[in-house]
Each structure stands twice: as structure tokens, then as C-alpha cells.
Amino acid sequence: AAERSERIPDIVIITGMSGSGRTQAMHVFEDMGYFCIDNLPPRLIAQLAELVGINTGVGRHLAVTCDLRSQGLFDELLDAVAALEEREMSCDIVFLEASDEVLIRRYSENRRRHPIAKPGETTADAIQRERLQLQGVRDRADMIIDTSRLRTSALRNKLRMAFSELSDQQLMDVHVFSFGFKHGMPVEADIM
């Protein structure tokens, strides 16, 4: 079992392979009360952190996803992290990845083309090219999560254990209510 982090960073940057679950991870951070922005260019992270009021003592946290497929954006990300550290804002990079087979299957199931696939290029070739482009970011990441065999609930638990200020009891949300079978089972009921 993962241990709860002693330090919750002010800013979490979520990046990684296309199709590895960045959007799902962003939903988890949103549920934990983070201010979330999807596909933010790295050079805007420090400015956004100041606008949102990160590091002002109000206990607010920021999560952003960054799409780093273009080589210049990796350098921008490192510059952004350095700028945050200069402003005494803590920052963690979470890198999500999955095996080639799983990524190919996910793109096939969704009937989507890989975002960096060139005309006539196979999904497998595009994935390999993207993996090479992102190797430097992966090496710099504070947390690497392989989502190949993870269900969304397991990803949620990993991220909550690492980045939530709430205790396990506060993370569990239980609603008890009564109903009549005459009107059918409540649609929002998970367990009866």
C-alpha cells in the first residue's frame, strides 16, 4: 500500500504518454479540491499560480496537465519548475505511462488517431516516437505511474494517497437514505 505523503506540493504537473490517463488523473485532482487547468503551456504555470493565489497561506493547490510532445516545451517545463522554486512554491511532476500494447488497444477502442501520428504512420510508430520525445520529462518526474494494468479506481487511490490532505475517513463518502422498492431502485445507489 502506498504511504501518505508528508508534504503536499503547491502545484502538481501531470504529463505523460497520450492515452495513459492524464484526463482521468485531472478528474481525481479536481475531486480533491485542486484548481485544475488542462493543457496549459508550461511558461504560464508560474503566472497562473500567482493569479490563483498559490503559496498565500490559503491552502489552495493547483494541478495542470501539460502536453509536452514538442521538444521546446520540455525546456519550458524545466524553466517553469525553476521559476516556481524561485518563488518558493513546491512543485511535483507526475508522469503517466502505459505499455505500447495497452495504448494501441485504447486508441483502437476509442477509434481515435494518435495525436502525433503522421499521415500513413502506424499508431505503434507514433507511440514509439512519443515515448522517445518524453524520455527527458520521465527522467525528471517525481512520480511515475504505469496505468497499463490500473483501473481508474486504483489510479484515484494512488493519487489520493500521494496528494490529498484529507484522511482516509474524509476521503470516503457515504450516503445513507431510505427508499421504497415500489418506485424502483435509486439510480445513484452503489450498494444496497
Task: Locate the predicted segments by residue.
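Conserved nucleotide-binding/hydrolysis micro-motifs of P-loop NTPases
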Residues: 69-72, 98-103, 150-152, 180-184
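Short, hydrophobic/glycine-enriched beta-strand segments
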Residues: 10-17, 174-178
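Pre-Walker A (Motif I) flank of P-loop NTPase domains
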Residues: 7-12, 59-62
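Conserved C-terminal guanine-recognition region of P-loop GTPase G domains, centered on the G4
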Residues: 77-87, 99-101
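Conserved nucleotide-sensing/catalytic segment adjacent to the nucleotide-binding pocket
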Residues: 30-82
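Glycine-rich phosphate-binding P-loop
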Residues: 13-29
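C-terminal accessory "lid"/substrate-recognition subdomains
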Residues: 1-3, 125-191
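A glycine- and Lys/Arg-enriched "phosphate-lid" helix/loop adjacent to the NTP-binding pocket
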Residues: 89-134, 143-150
